[in-house]
Amino acid sequence: GYVELGYTDDAPAVGYAKLAASTAGKVKTVTSGGAEYLVIKVDTTAGTVGFIM
């Protein structure tokens, strides 16, 4: 399903990205570990990312 969460560190790019849990229920982009998800929305103003799980 689709989910929107806050992100920490750098904003993920739209497309496939490796994401992992971060602090306070947010996610972050990682190069190793995590899982690959399809990112379809990035809102840098709100600090949120929407992706398909």
Regions found by a protein language model. Name each.
Residues 1-53:
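Surface-exposed, low-hydrophobicity beta-strand/loop segments enriched in small/polar/acidic residues
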